[in-house]
A protein has these predicted regions:
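Contiguous alpha-helical segments
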Residues: 2-110, 115-151
Length: 151
C-alpha cells in the first residue's frame, strides 16, 4: 500500500455522516461570500458559507483529520502518515494490515499513546489498541496474561 492509498483510506473509508452547512449569501451586504484561500492547498475559491475554509472535499477531510490528530495526540497528519509508513501500514503488535472492525468495514490504524505522558508509542489495529486498554497498559498484567495463554 502506498502513502497516498493509505491517506485515501484514512480520509474516505469511514461511515461518518456528512454535515451540510448552508447559508444565504443574500444576508450579507455584498450579496455573496468573499473569496478566500484554501487552508490546505492555498487555492483561491468562493465558499458556499462564511465558515467554509477548504476548496474541495479532499482538502476539507485532510484538514479535519489533521486538526483531530493535532488536538488529540499532538501530531500532524503528516507525522501520522510517517509512522504508518515506517510500520509498512500494519499494526505494530500483530502485524495485520486489513483488520475487520465490523461487517464490511476495515479500519485504519489508531494512535497508541501513553495515557500518563501523552507520548505516542506507535500505531495499532483497533483490536490490539483495545486489548492494551483493557489491560490498563499494565506491563505486569500483560506479562501474566502472556504466561496464562501459554498453558
Amino acid at each position: 500500500m502506498t502513502r497516498e492509498e493509505y491517506l485515501h483510506k484514512l480520509l474516505y473509508d469511514h461511515n461518518k455522516p456528512k454535515n451540510k452547512q448552508t447559508a444565504n449569501p443574500k444576508k450579507y451586504p455584498q450579496g455573496y461570500f468573499k473569496s478566500k484561500k484554501c487552508r490546505k492547498c492555498g487555492k483561491e475559491f468562493t465558499p458556499k458559507a462564511p465558515s467554509e475554509h477548504y476548496c474541495c472535499e479532499y482538502c476539507k477531510k485532510y484538514g479535519e483529520a489533521d486538526a483531530y490528530y493535532r488536538r488529540v495526540y499532538g501530531i500532524s497528519i503528516e507525522e501520522y502518515l510517517d509512522l504508518a509508513e515506517k510500520q509498512n501500514f500494519v499494526c505494530a503488535l500483530c502485524g495485520e494490515a486489513n483488520f475487520a472492525m465490523g461487517c464490511n468495514h476495515t479500519g485504519c490504524l489508531v494512535v497508541d499513546h501513553n495515557h500518563k505522558t501523552g507520548k505516542v508509542r506507535g500505531l495499532l489495529c483497533h483490536n490490539c489498541n483495545r486489548a492494551l486498554g483493557l489491560f490498563h497498559d499494565n506491563p505486569e498484567l500483560i506479562q501474566k496474561a502472556s504466561e496464562y495463554v501459554k498453558v
